[in-house]
């Protein structure tokens, strides 16, 4: 069973964020992560290791008719940084963190989806779009820089427009 637009657009971000936070526990894949930023702008101090998530615009993957079920694509970008004294070590550590983020998504998305949607299936597939050592950001108060590695994962999910219209017509 698919979900309607009211649920689908709200839950996609919750599910993907949940995949990361589920592993930011003792003995988790991301236990060492100090900061998880899930907004576009962070005003506070960012401690590393850091994972920064950005949800990009959702587009129709195929079939743009809004009178039926749509397959949508929502790209999520994860930018990961780890400080090490040696820049080569920091680069390797940032790439390792990025790899563990991918693993966290793959490990948890089905379980979290089942919990959030009470057994309904919304996410159909998650694919790697691109993996990129993006560059460096300066460290406040130091001449050092932290290498950042990024990955974009495309999350394909279904929305049932008809179900939404039926619920509105029925007053649900």
Task: Give the ranges of each region predicted by the language model.
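A short glycine-rich, His/Asp/Glu-containing loop-to-beta-strand
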Residues: 49-53
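A short, polar/charged loop/turn motif at coil->beta-strand junctions and beta-hairpin connectors
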Residues: 45-47
């Amino acid at each position: 069973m698919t979900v309607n637009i009211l649920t689908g657009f709200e839950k996609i971000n919750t599910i993907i964020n949940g995949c990361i936070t589920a592993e930011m526990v003792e003995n988790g894949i991301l236990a060492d992560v100090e900061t998880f930023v899930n907004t576009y702008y962070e005003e506070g101090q960012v401690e590393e290791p850091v994972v920064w998530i950005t949800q990009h615009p959702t587009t129709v993957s195929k079939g743009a008719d809004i009178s039926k079920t749509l397959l949508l694509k929502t790209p999520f970008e994860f930018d990961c940084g780890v400080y090490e004294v040696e820049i080569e070590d920091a680069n390797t550590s940032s790439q390792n963190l990025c790899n563990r983020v991918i693993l966290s998504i793959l490990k948890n998305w089905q379980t979290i989806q089942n919990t959030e949607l009470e057994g309904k299936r919304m996410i159909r597939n998650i694919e790697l779009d691109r993996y990129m050592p993006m560059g460096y950001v300066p460290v406040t108060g130091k001449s050092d820089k932290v290498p950042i590695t990024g990955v974009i994962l495309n999350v394909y999910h279904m929305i049932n427009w008809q179900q939404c219209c039926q619920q509105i017509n029925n007053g649900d």
